């Protein structure tokens, strides 16, 4: 369920995503139906905070100790954008790109983390958004394939 006011109905059956009022931190483009910028869905931090929040405590290759990551599930972000596809291209602030099967967002509780140990993440700390799989909860995810899909400094998701 989306936060009240996040979406407004359009006569075409698509949904209009409310426009961001703050700095855009995430753009979802490609095969999306719910837009607020022509053909893209743009999110500011309050919009992401308005989605249901989830946490996972897990280790990653970048952190030796288990850390707590909190944010909306990737599948909820995609649902807010009305995304439908087979592949997600994740693009970071430094232009790092990695492809993730769309199904990963549905099968795993992948989080678009906005908090690290309950604090907002600065760019120098891999923020402001970090795609995190529940590595410690699902041992089969502890592999180079899934680690490479955990893009930090996420800025764009292209739905293909």
Predicted regions and their residues:
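N-terminal export leaders
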Residues: 1-2, 6
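N-terminal signal peptide c-region/cleavage motif recognized by signal peptidases
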Residues: 9-11
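N-terminal intrinsically disordered, low-complexity segments enriched in P/E/S/T
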Residues: 13-160
């Amino acid at each position: 369920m989306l936060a009240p006011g996040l979406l407004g109905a359009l006569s075409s059956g698509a949904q209009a995503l409310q426009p961001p009022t703050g700095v855009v931190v995430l753009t979802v483009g490609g095969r999306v139906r719910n837009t607020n910028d022509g053909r893209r869905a743009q999110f500011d931090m309050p919009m992401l905070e308005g989605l249901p929040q989830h946490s996972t405590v897990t280790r990653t290759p970048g952190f030796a100790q288990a850390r707590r990551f909190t944010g909306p599930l990737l599948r909820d972000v995609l649902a807010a954008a009305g995304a439908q596809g087979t592949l997600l291209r994740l693009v970071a602030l430094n232009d790092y790109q990695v492809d993730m099967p769309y199904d990963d967002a549905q099968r795993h509780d992948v989080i678009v983390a906005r908090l690290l140990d309950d604090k907002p993440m600065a760019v120098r700390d891999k923020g402001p958004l970090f795609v995190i799989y529940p590595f410690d909860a699902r041992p089969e995810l502890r592999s180079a394939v899934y680690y490479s899909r955990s893009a930090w400094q996420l800025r764009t998701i292209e739905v293909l």
